[in-house]
């Protein structure tokens, strides 16, 4: 049988001789490959150290400016390629010997170059430099460049964030200042000036208190309370005389149920203590109760401005002892020998009873003593007298404000006095709010009751002053009361009141505004710092780019030197290719 015909391609590896194939060497195994194939001696490290020491000594004798004029600059290390460049530069300007040899520094560097080329020591140095540059130097520079690029991007992002935050802080500060009604130029002075708005707001509150609807609401409240608490027909009464009449007691009048509200409505508000001064103190002394000198103080401890009133009780006291007995005069004895039977009989006669006088044994009930004093009538008369005296005193004090004082009370207008009192007297203001809240609660409950219906039986027993008020009227009264309470409870009013009366609140408010104003400056400073970091990152990138490019170019030249040197050591018959990561590094640098 004949052999099958086999097609063979000319120029493929099968037909090419081995001597013509290229040699591929990994850059990381280059020195090992050279030593293994005995292209360089095993002690090439020692020989290289000797050559580098001679080169370092020769560098000191170079003319100034020689290194800076080289390809890689003055900072590049001295290796074989640099030695060749120095020799060629010096040889171009150096004198030669009779036989054409180099003289001076050029001859020294020519010897260094020949030492490198002897036994291909420079190939070991080139392989070592390739590994150092590809595995360490270039990756470090690239990581550093990526880090600087990240810092640059982060700086740009932070600059935008800080700029927006500064604008937000400025807008918030302006909004707070606008809400407070200040410009923000001089915070504390402007905040203090805000307190001047408070008298006008309080005068508006006082004017609202004079609405007729509030008077109707208070009278409606008093009428309903009198009806609810009035004694019913057939109920036992323990009082006698005028106290058992059908008239309402003073405590159930609108003026006594809502005292502060009607004090302002009747324009009887006393000025603040700081403005009333001694006149206010004198008025309070004249309008007070009657002081009784009991004779046991031993000095002039009675009320100032009011003479002590001596009351003769028509009863002797117990006998004093010692010096007190001598000063008090003769002793008087009191006979406490009462006959309870006689007292009970007298009480029975006064009551019109016909039964026999009870005895004083243990079975007898409690005995009441009639002192023949009408307590209720006397108390009412005394209370009315004191109220009239107090009204006169308060009126005089309010009238005296026209000649002195300051602020809103200096005009002498009772409404201005009330506004000043509400501003400076927290207790007085709280009592007014209590009166209005009490009135509002009553009206709200009555509105709910009237809206629920089913009160026909109760309505028949109500007096006309209560039954004539329908749900719509109660709602109108409730709206008036809530409007006044709304004026006293607005955030603006509370804030102005705190600014005017609380230095600590003023300090805290000023500190908060100052912090908001400083926040914008902090954000702007942070933005400026971010811009400075961007400049530093750009400068680092700008300085690093030429260094990386020079190092990559150096690696490319070293690679060519190695490939040509190994090919020359092999007689120039085979080409050499240095492979591995070095090609990726050079390719990425070329993009």
From Swiss-Prot:
Pfam families: CDK5RAP3. A motif (Shuffled ATG8-binding motif 3) lies at residues 369-372. A motif (Shuffled ATG8-binding motif 1) lies at residues 311-314. Residues 279-303 have a biased composition (Gly residues). InterPro entries: CDK5RAP3. Residues 232-250, 386-401 have a biased composition (Low complexity). GO terms for cellular component: endomembrane system. Residues 232-252, 269-303, 386-416 are annotated as: Disordered. A motif (Shuffled ATG8-binding motif 2) lies at residues 334-337. It comes from the Eukaryota. GO terms for biological process: regulation of mitotic cell cycle. Disulfide bonds: none annotated. The shuffled ATG8-binding motifs mediate interaction with both ATG8 family protein and UFM1. Substrate adapter component of the UFM1 ribosome E3 ligase (UREL) complex. Interacts with ATG8 family proteins. PANTHER family: CDK5 REGULATORY SUBUNIT-ASSOCIATED PROTEIN 3 (PTHR14894:SF0). Substrate adapter of E3 ligase complexes mediating ufmylation, the covalent attachment of the ubiquitin-like modifier UFM1 to substrate proteins, and which is involved in various processes, such as ribosome recycling and reticulophagy (also called ER-phagy). Belongs to the CDK5RAP3 family. This is CDK5RAP3 protein homolog. It comes from Chlamydomonas reinhardtii (Chlamydomonas smithii).
